[in-house]
From Swiss-Prot:
Residues 25-249 form the Peptidase S1 domain. InterPro entries: Peptidase_S1_PA, Peptidase_S1_PA_chymotrypsin, Peptidase_S1A, Trypsin_dom, TRYPSIN_HIS, TRYPSIN_SER. It comes from Trimeresurus stejnegeri (Chinese green tree viper). This is Snake venom serine protease 5. PANTHER family: KALLIKREIN-1 (PTHR24271:SF47), KALLIKREIN-RELATED (PTHR24271). It is an enzyme of class 3 (hydrolase). CDD domains: Tryp_SPc. Residues 19-24 form a propeptide. Keywords: Disulfide bond, Glycoprotein, Hemostasis impairing toxin, Hydrolase, Protease, Secreted, Serine protease, Signal, Toxin, Zymogen. Residues 1-18 form the signal peptide. GO terms for cellular component: extracellular region; secretory granule.
Length: 258
């Protein structure tokens, strides 16, 4: 069964309402404190919502299905229990979606661009991630990261984000694995065919990093997570690059590719 991967609870907060299933980093290891400087935590009064990616001092990219009322963002987080001295908090000044009605599907337009209320200062634990200069190559080894559950079906949320390497597949692999996917879409297919490594509940909106570039956004996948021959589906950042750059440049009427 294919479900959108919305985030569970990070840090010490816990959601009190039902969420869509999201993906976690199952089968990974604790991230090095210096390798997730662009990783953002989105949360509201009910708890943690999603991950996100800082792309410059004023803008964050995450999944459209992570949108919620009155959410905040924390930058520079590593441990839930031991805050970094350089952690910073911001709120959205503006939110942009591919569709003015916030319409998106499991294979199209699951992306949200957030303008921050004030710039984030780069620091020891905070730095933006480069947007892609070219599309990723099938066969690439890519990095996933997040505070999502590291076990499934019983959920275990770690103190620090977990990271794992997964492989980028031809889209036809996901098309064959997940019922309902169209023959083509503006998404990436990534995982481990033998299973055991995957994003999962709590990781939605976070980055898929290939060769040091921000190539994908955690969107959705199989349920349970990390099953053999069921790679995850990630919004393809490169296909939305013109839209992102136009919005940042001030062209707020820019549209996403069809």
């Amino acid at each position: 069964m294919v479900l959108i991967r919305v985030l569970a609870n990070l840090l010490i907060l816990q959601l009190s309402y039902a969420q869509k299933s999201s993906e976690l980093v199952v089968g990974g290891r604790p991230c090095n404190i210096n390798e997730h400087r662009s990783l953002v935590v989105l949360f509201n009064s009910s708890g943690f919502l999603c991950g996100g990616t800082l792309i410059n001092q004023d803008w964050v990219v995450t999944a459209a299905h992570c949108d919620s009322n009155n959410f905040q963002m924390i930058f520079g987080v590593h441990s839930k229990n031991v805050p970094n001295e350089d952690e910073q908090r911001r709120v959205p000044k503006e939110k942009f979606f591919c569709d003015s009605n916030k319409n998106y599907t499991q294979w199209n337009k699951d992306i949200m661009l957030i303008r921050l209320n004030s710039p984030v200062n780069n620091s020891t634990h905070i730095a933006p991630l480069s947007l892609p200069s070219s599309p990723p190559i099938v066969g690439s080894v890519c990095r996933i990261m997040g505070w999502g559950t590291i076990t499934f079906p019983n959920e275990t949320y770690p103190d620090v984000p977990h990271c794992a390497n997964i492989n980028l597949f031809n889209y036809t692999v996901c098309h064959g694995a997940h019922a309902g996917l169209p023959a083509t879409s503006r998404t990436l297919c990534a995982g481990v065919l033998e299973g055991g490594k995957d994003t999962c509940k709590g990781d939605s909106g976070g980055p898929l990093i290939c060769n040091g570039q921000f190539q994908g956004i955690v969107s959705w996948g199989g349920h349970p997570c990390a099953q053999p021959r069921e790679p995850g589906v990630y919004t393809k950042v490169f296909d939305h690059l013109d839209w992102i750059q136009n919005i940042i440049a001030g062209n707020t009427t820019a549209t996403c590719p069809l």
